[in-house]
Amino acid sequence: MFGQQLASDVQQYLERLEKQRQLKVGADEASAGLTMGGDALRVPFLDFATATPKRHQTVVPGVGTLHDCCEHSPLFSAVARRLLFNSLVPAQLKGRDFGGDHTAKLEFLAPELVRAVARLRFKECAPADVVPQRNAYYSVLNTFQALHRSEAFRQLVHFVRDFAQLLKTSFRASSLTETTGPPKKRAKVDVATHGRTYGTLELFQKMILMHATYFLAAVLLGDHAEQVNTFLRLVFEIPLFSDAAVRHFRQRATVFLVPRRHGKTWFLVPLIALSLASFRGIKIGYTAHIRKATEPVFEEIDACLRGWFGSARVDHVKGETISFSFPDGSRSTIVFASSHNTNGIRGQDFNLLFVDEANFIRPDAVQTIMGFLNQANCKIIFVSSTNTGKASTSFLYNLRGAADELLNVVTYICDDHMPRVVTHTNATACSCYILNKPVFITMDGAVRRTADLFLADSFMQEIIGGQARETGDDRPVLTKSAGERFLLYRPSTTTNSGLMAPDLYVYVDPAFTANTRASGTGVAVVGRYRDDYIIFALEHFFLRALTGSAPADIARCVVHSLTQVLALHPGAFRGVRVAVEGNSSQDSAVAIATHVHTEMHRLLASEGADAGSGPELLFYHCEPPGSAVLYPFFLLNKQKTPAFEHFIKKFNSGGVMASQEIVSATVRLQTDPVEYLLEQLNNLTETVSPNTDVRTYSGKRNGASDDLMVAVIMAIYLAAQAGPPHTFAPITRVS
């Protein structure tokens, strides 16, 4: 009791002496304080004040009382507060990017700004006039000085200093003291870049370090947790991080999903060992999916502590606990357990609980671990590879989209491009990210093909951690936004005929198969609208029989649809180019073309039009294999893939539209022709052969027909091609 009272009296006496010293110092000592390592806590109060109400004032140690708008200037706020801890940043972390000694030299400021500020002269206030400002200044200053004097903050500073030393030697230092020899590099670590001779951290490793450090600082420093944020922003080089982002690192659970062989467990070993050796009285838990996975970690941590501090301060129970002793008698402890025996961590009081390979731990072990969420001073850090082979080894993916943003996924493929990378066997990353892939990682197309030779989709499941393609699951290729635009935006072609090209393209996909209900006849009439393509007519129908008068019936429907388009746009078109597909029946295709030619000329003649006044009617002609005669039909062979690719590109970019005055004698009776076409387009899928990378397109999904879709795609393809002169020609040439 007497000792406690004596300690309290001594502390009060020290505070009185400190206050007296602050009252005696003058503004002339300010410059001397700034030159002593750039530590703003040594700068006395400067006799100046801001002419603003007290509620709008803020105090910045080393600067003074300012308008609180300065708090909302990220550059000023970061620079001013970084001066508070500049002398405490380890030399290994200085001179990197924006921080360290560069701050004291103002190297990040424009020379013109430095010269302008140097010319400013401030009016010195009388000491009696700035008593409130002086009191407020020293009140804030005393808070930061109390932080500096606290034992917990010293432990944090030592942790940062020692971690910087470990980073310098790539975590292979035999001692935590400074060494003058060359840094020891592990054989697999990435080579030094930009002239650096120290090791570097992967981004996810730095994130794990920040999560652990921020939480331990909040637990150990208590009331000073807010002030220490400035120091940690300086250490981690995140001066512009918002307060919300900083609070993210204090949350009591976080999950990291990292591809295989990226240094997850390798990084946890020095982090845990140094935490035990730096923070007095903390307790750490470590659990993995099997005991064989915890034993190497136990041995590595034990070896690190003994190598740094000797065996006298390290005590352990084989495979279960490691205790580290401090000179004052306090101890820090780590407890190990596997998911098969999580009773070892029940009843413990952890500050950090690391769950390694969390995707593979037993469900009952997850329940035990979740119990620690009820402990206010415990943080659970889940670290696992991103296996997606089955739900039981991918349950952490369920955290995606959570409001508290628990999940951190390290990936080389974004969600949008994952389906495309899955279908392309040589791809191992998408173009969205430029990641620093470790040099000890071999991840290319050859590795992917080799892995998939042993077991299908093993690369995407086990190595990269992406979503594996389900069997028979083809990928849709048209975007939802493009489909909505196609459905809603329909320009009027009757009032904008001057924007259209003078040629119409008609594609007929006749049905001549035994299954008359599954395969119908599709007809599309398209043209050019500025640089885009526009659909004027759509027809889709099924015939009762495909013999006898079927060619004449198909031709009659084509003619009726075409003449309606011409009637709605009088004088707008000078040519009509018709292509009749002949893959099913070349004889029927020739018959359809002949009937269209005859019927069109009969209708034009009945209207009293001259042969030269109407649009020129041309038919696609091709030369079948083994023949020297051109026939009026179109053979669809190798043109299908480029035609579909051209259509997909134009459709997704908004280059395919439907006319507001669209014509349809067969579809409009049932539904909107554009909606009807869009239903077929939504069935369009792309399949890539896993061995040859050959793409095939199909619209026959779930038994749906694709005749109208094929007719539209091929009509647009023909409208975009500049074929040879004889490609389109009249059936009866005009002499």
Swiss-Prot record:
UniProt subcellular location: Host nucleus
Position of sequence motif Nuclear localization signal: 183-189
Short name of any one Pfam family annotated for the protein: DNA_pack_C
Motif Walker A motif positions after renumbering to this chain: 258-265
Active site: 357 (for atpase activity), 509 (for nuclease activity), 581 (for nuclease activity), 707 (for nuclease activity)
Keyword list, A-Z: DNA-binding, Host nucleus, Hydrolase, Viral genome packaging, Viral release from host cell
Motif position, Walker B motif: 352-357
Annotated GO MF terms: DNA binding; hydrolase activity
Keyword DNA-binding part of the UniProt annotation: yes
Coarse class of the protein's main subcellular location: host cell
GO annotation, cellular component aspect: host cell nucleus
EC number: 3.1.-.-
GO biological process, alphabetically ordered: chromosome organization
Function: Component of the molecular motor that translocates viral genomic DNA in empty capsid during DNA packaging. Forms a tripartite terminase complex together with TRM1 and TRM2 in the host cytoplasm. Once the complex reaches the host nucleus, it interacts with the capsid portal vertex. This portal forms a ring in which genomic DNA is translocated into the capsid. TRM3 carries an RNase H-like nuclease activity that plays an important role for the cleavage of concatemeric viral DNA into unit length genomes.
Protein family (similarity comment): Belongs to the herpesviridae TRM3 protein family.
Subunit-structure text: Interacts with the terminase subunits TRM1 and TRM2. Interacts with portal protein.
Entry protein name: Tripartite terminase subunit 3
Organism: Human herpesvirus 1 (strain 17) (HHV-1)
